[in-house]
A protein has these predicted regions:
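Substrate-binding/gating loop at the entrance of the active-site cleft, primarily
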Residues: 272
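Nucleotide/pyrophosphate-binding catalytic subdomain
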Residues: 1-268
């Protein structure tokens, strides 16, 4: 399989009927998107959405509408989500002081418990519920379910922060066969059953490879990946894994983006 195409999409510009376009503009959008609909009909598309999008009720609702629209035109979406802001908010309410190293949350046993509660019990439920307003379409999954995400420890100094050791996509594939929309939270477990919190970008990339996805869409509330950090007009809208590796090598991808750069490892992910 060739590398899935990676794209940054700003969720503030959805393609639903409530996006603020005039009727003639919506017609133009549909005409422009028809070739893409035809191209990707029947194909798996992994959609990674960050926790910031879920903090805005209107934005979350429009995201759900867009996922349902993809499904309705024959595309097979698989949603992978993060939940960093929600984890941070609950930790603050509980009086737990967060610690970050190299852009990653240091995760002790207490923090891991909070992350599991938020990702599996809150953010995942909210996304599933938002989609299912439009019909019984979405099914929520944790990476622990059916051995979907086999995790390994990234660095003992980070605690229970994990990497993807392997993906067993069988449960996701079964849901896709049933024309359902899998919604995956990024808690995985090692072979002993120990849970780990894994970066959602990393999971999205690994899952895309395991499923043979045609494309990955990254929805972000930031400007995206810039060829020149001082020039907002230099945003890179799409690239493959080889191009991303080049950007890492020449320093365009900076230390502050290290948690995302694992996306460049698409070809090296092991599947079961």
């Amino acid at each position: 399989m060739s590398d899935p195409l990676i794209m940054d999409v700003n969720p503030d510009t959805p393609i639903t009927s409530d996006s603020g376009f005039a009727p003639e503009q919506r017609a133009g959008v549909l005409v422009e998107t028809l070739p893409y609909i035809q191209r990707f009909a029947g194909q798996v598309v992994v959609v990674k959405v960050g926790g910031h999008a879920m903090d805005d009720g209107d934005l979350a609702a429009r995201f759900a509408e867009d996922v349902v629209l993809m499904h309705s035109v024959g595309i097979r979406p698989v949603v992978v989500h993060g939940g960093g802001p929600q984890i941070g908010a609950l930790m603050e309410r509980l009086g737990i002081q967060p610690e970050f190293r190299e852009g990653l949350r240091v995760t002790d046993a207490e923090t891991l418990e909070v992350a599991r509660m938020v990702l599996v019990g809150k953010v995942n439920r909210d996304i599933v519920s938002g989609i299912n307003v439009h019909g019984p379409l979405a099914v929520g999954l944790s990476g622990e379910d059916a051995g979907l995400i086999i995790a390994s420890a990234r660095n003992p100094e980070l605690g229970y922060v994990g990497d993807v050791a392997a993906i067993n996509p069988a449960i996701v594939e079964r849901l896709l066969v049933e024309s359902l929309i899998p919604v995956v939270s990024t808690i995985g477990a090692d072979p002993t059953g120990q849970p780990y919190n894994i970066n959602a970008d990393t999971v999205a990339a690994a899952l895309a490879v395991a499923l043979g996805a045609e494309r990955i869409l990254y929805l972000t509330d930031v400007e995206g990946l810039l060829a020149d950090t001082d020039d907002p007009d230099s945003r890179i809208s799409s690239l493959d894994s080889a191009a991303l590796e080049d950007l890492i090598a020449d320093g365009t991808v900076s230390a502050g983006m290290r948690s995302e750069e694992h996306t460049s490892e698409l070809q090296s992910r092991e599947t079961i």
